[in-house]
């Protein structure tokens, strides 16, 4: 049981750190777009690279946040029904629906990993005038899938422990308005 709690705490801490890091990443994204708007509309001097970099940064931000969102209970539920269930019923429903979750994430890991490996092995670059490498952005897909799968495993373990009536207090507790 100690190993399980340590595993849960470790994965929760990793996804919590990634989520917090990404929140600062969003600030950099905002600054980048702000500078581009100023250059484009006030100085009539748009950059070649800002749009493409913004797409890559936001793509990484959006996909890498999945594990953190799962940790804090931010993914979509049918709350009107789900919140009326007891904790054990919610855990049972989550266990049943986790098969779809793991199927999707497994496919994302396998196919995203294949896409990333292909891009990395060819040192793929964009076809734009800026010509940045694309493989760092594509490597975010299997990385995000792995983080999401690991967080899904911790959620699955918590749900099983709830069904068994065990203590599930390992890891950070969700904030106000959030649930695991």
Q: Model-predicted segments: where are they?
A:
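Alpha-helical transmembrane segments and membrane-interface helix-loop junctions
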Residues: 1-180
């Amino acid at each position: 049981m100690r190993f399980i709690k340590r595993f849960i705490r470790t994965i929760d801490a990793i996804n919590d750190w990634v989520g917090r890091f990404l929140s600062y990443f969003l600030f950099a994204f905002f600054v980048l777009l702000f500078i581009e708007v100023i250059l484009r509309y006030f100085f009539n001097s748009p950059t070649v690279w800002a749009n493409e970099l913004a797409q890559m940064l936001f793509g990484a931000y959006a996909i890498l946040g999945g594990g953190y969102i799962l940790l804090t209970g931010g993914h979509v539920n049918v709350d009107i029904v789900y919140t009326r269930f007891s904790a054990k019923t919610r855990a049972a429903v989550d266990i049943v629906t986790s098969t779809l979750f793991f199927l999707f994430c497994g496919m994302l890991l396998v196919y995203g990993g294949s896409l990333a490996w292909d891009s990395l092995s060819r040192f793929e670059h964009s076809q734009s005038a800026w010509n940045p490498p694309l493989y760092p952005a594509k490597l975010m897909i299997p990385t995000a899938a792995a983080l999401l799968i690991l967080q899904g495993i911790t959620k699955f373990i918590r749900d099983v422990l709830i069904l068994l009536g065990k203590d599930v207090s390992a890891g950070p507790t969700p904030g106000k308005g959030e649930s695991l």
